[in-house]
């Protein structure tokens, strides 16, 4: 890491300000060559202060009126000397300035290379580095919260605590191996097993937290299903608050599925409007119905729309029970035209099922439907809204934790069956090494390269 790197750190496009980040031992030296201060009293860059001046090309050509800041190592993001050039945010202007910087024997940074240097220089562990990328990619408040908690180091601290517990168990094993005849070498088997089970429980809770939080990170898919003319497309428009789907009185208007996303209390919901379910001789409509059924089968939640003016039909009852009531919400539409009986959900299925009455035309009940849908998803995933101390590992980390649990279970069975203590010590070292790979202590280089390559350039 002896070379100096640079990249545009702000999103591509046009904006008021664009930032070029430079990191490495030659950062300040190259800044001095390119920057001309507007202040006649300027002599040198004061660290951590913005300096206004002109950026000039090697040909002495004026490029931009900028603010520059020099940040000396080691208390920077990368742990190296860092310079930031705050320029006007024109896309081609930034490219021109970057080309000028790169002419000064500075290399273009690879994707994620600034974060990789921060990790390699000990400014953050691997869980924090991954959190940076997830924070940038977050599309809801709860995703931001989950990523920022890892960026604070909460998961890394939890892993360090688990490793400390494992080291205590390993010390007991080593004493029993090295001093079998002495009092200090008496192996506390039950205490060891209890400690092992406590570690297992801690990791199991982390995995369960990830499973429960899947809806925040991945969102959910909700299919709008029902008979023709039940008002599925009208309901889609009402939920979106805009006219997205074509609505007519003619049956079979929707011949293909439509997809749109909404955010409800930081939960990303992908709504899919499907073709009305019926027997048809139209091959195009039949193809749309088949596609719709596939989307319904794949959906996390089904909003089964009932035409209130038609009421209960045997076909609807059959469809609802085939779809599975555990992922279905019954929606009695057109309540402005006909109010259902108080026990209307029981007319469709003997099982407990959620139901609500709405009018897609007037908007009655739409807000209540969104609340019901939100709570339904949370109940379905056994999820809770994250707080400022919620620790949720990502997919890679969960995979490693799952392997750790398998190793702990094997150790539990083996020590119960009486295997030699020195083999138990080896298994504990293996568990500790797995945990190290999560925070980056023993992570293979190819894994690190793959992780940081997924970052954007400039981060």
Swiss-Prot record:
Mg(2+) binds at residues 233, 254. Coiled coil: none annotated. (6S)-5-formyl-5,6,7,8-tetrahydrofolate binds at residues 21, 84, 123, 459. GO terms for molecular function: GTP binding; GTPase activity; metal ion binding. Its EC number is 3.6.-.-. GO terms for biological process: tRNA methylation; tRNA wobble uridine modification. Its cofactor is K(+). Residues 219-378 form the TrmE-type G domain. Keywords: Cytoplasm, GTP-binding, Hydrolase, Magnesium, Metal-binding, Nucleotide-binding, Potassium, tRNA processing. It comes from the Bacteria. It holds the Pfam family TrmE_N. Its main location: cytoplasm. GTP binds at residues 229-234, 248-254, 273-276. SUPFAM superfamilies: P-loop containing nucleoside triphosphate hydrolases. The keyword Repeat does not apply. Binds 1 potassium ion per subunit. InterPro entries: G_TrmE, GTP-bd, GTP-bd_TrmE_N, GTPase_MnmE, MnmE_dom2, MnmE_helical, P-loop_NTPase, Small_GTP-bd. GO terms for cellular component: cytosol. It is found in: Cytoplasm. Exhibits a very high intrinsic GTPase hydrolysis rate. Involved in the addition of a carboxymethylaminomethyl (cmnm) group at the wobble position (U34) of certain tRNAs, forming tRNA-cmnm(5)s(2)U34. Homodimer. Heterotetramer of two MnmE and two MnmG subunits. Belongs to the TRAFAC class TrmE-Era-EngA-EngB-Septin-like GTPase superfamily. TrmE GTPase family. This is tRNA modification GTPase MnmE. It comes from Lawsonia intracellularis (strain PHE/MN1-00).
């Amino acid at each position: 890491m002896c070379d100096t790197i640079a990249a545009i750190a702000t999103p591509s496009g046009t904006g008021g300000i664009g930032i070029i980040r430079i990191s490495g031992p030659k950062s300040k030296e190259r800044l001095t060559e390119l920057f001309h201060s507007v202040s006649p009293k300027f002599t040198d860059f004061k660290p951590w202060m913005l300096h206004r001046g002109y950026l000039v090309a090697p040909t002495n050509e004026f490029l931009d009126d900028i603010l520059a800041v020099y940040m000396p190592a080691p208390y920077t993001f990368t742990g190296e000397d860092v310079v930031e050039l705050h320029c006007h945010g024109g896309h081609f202007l930034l490219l021109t300035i970057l080309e000028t910087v790169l002419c000064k024997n500075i290399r273009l940074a690879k994707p994620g290379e600034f974060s990789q240097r921060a990790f390699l220089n000990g400014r953050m562990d691997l869980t924090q580095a991954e959190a940076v990328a997830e924070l940038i990619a977050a599309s809801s408040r709860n995703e931001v919260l989950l990523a920022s908690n890892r960026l604070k180091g909460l998961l890394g601290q939890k892993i360090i605590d688990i490793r400390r517990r494992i080291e205590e168990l390993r010390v007991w094993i080593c004493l029993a191996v090295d001093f079998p005849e002495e009092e200090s070498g008496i192996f506390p088997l039950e205490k060891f097993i209890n400690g092992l089970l406590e570690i297992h429980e801690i990791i199991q809770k982390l995995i369960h937290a990830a499973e429960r939080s899947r809806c925040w990170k991945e969102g959910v898919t909700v299919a709008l299903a029902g008979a023709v003319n039940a008002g599925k497309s009208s309901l889609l428009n009402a939920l979106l608050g805009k006219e997205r789907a074509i609505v007519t009185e003619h049956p079979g208007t929707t011949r293909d599925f439509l997809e749109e996303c909404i955010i409800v209390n930081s939960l990303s919901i992908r709504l899919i409007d499907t073709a009305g379910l019926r027997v048809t001789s139209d091959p195009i409509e039949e193809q749309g119905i088949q596609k719709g059924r596939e989307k319904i089968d794949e959906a996390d939640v089904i909003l089964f729309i009932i035409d209130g003016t038609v009421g209960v039909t045997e076909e609807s009852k059959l469809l609802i029970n085939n779809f599975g009531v555990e992922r279905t919400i019954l929606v009695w539409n057109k309540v402005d035209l006909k109010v259902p009986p108080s026990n209307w959900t029981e007319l469709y299925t003997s099982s407990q099922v959620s139901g609500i009455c709405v009018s897609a035309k007037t908007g009655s009940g739409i807000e209540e439907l969104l609340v019901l849908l939100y709570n339904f998803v949370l109940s379905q995933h056994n999820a809770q809204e994250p707080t400022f101390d919620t620790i949720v590992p990502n997919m890679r980390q969960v995979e490693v934790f799952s392997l750790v649990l398998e190793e702990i279970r094997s150790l539990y069975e083996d020590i119960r069956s009486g295997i030699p203590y020195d083999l138990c010590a080896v298994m504990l070292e293996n568990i500790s090494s797995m945990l190290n790979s999560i925070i980056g202590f023993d992570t293979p280089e190819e894994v690190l390269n793959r992780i940081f390559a997924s970052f954007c350039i400039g981060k």
